[in-house]
Amino acid sequence: MRSMSFEEAIKSLDSGIIVDIEVTPGSRSLSVPSGYNEWRKRIEVKLTRNAQKGKANEQLIESLAELFGICSSDIFISSGATSSKKSLLIKGVSYQQAVLVFGKHLKG
């Protein structure tokens, strides 16, 4: 069994968590999360929308909101809005919740 190193991409805050993500826009299929990059310490995400006019960011936020069962208004891009490497603030989600949810989807 692989170690749960994806936990390194999640940081706990008082108000929620910060998640480091690497996005591949314009993919054939939507996959949130799609894997973990252990060198960059980022959870990987594949989006079907292209990175034009914020469409991929919109899909990322909507997909994460659905994954965690929260409102998309509780998710903010704290850095990397125009980059494939992003950090997102997710309010109202604990570190333990995030590990459980991502872990369930990342176990191979």
Curated annotation (Swiss-Prot):
Pfam family for this entry, one: DUF167
Domain of life from the UniProt record: Archaea
InterPro entries associated with the record: DUF167, YggU-like_sf
SUPFAM superfamilies given in the database record: YggU-like
SMART domains reported for this sequence: DUF167
Similarity field: Belongs to the UPF0235 family.
Annotated protein name in UniProt: UPF0235 protein MM_0822
Organism field: Methanosarcina mazei (strain ATCC BAA-159 / DSM 3647 / Goe1 / Go1 / JCM 11833 / OCM 88)
Taxonomic lineage from the root: Archaea, Methanobacteriati, Methanobacteriota, Stenosarchaea group, Methanomicrobia
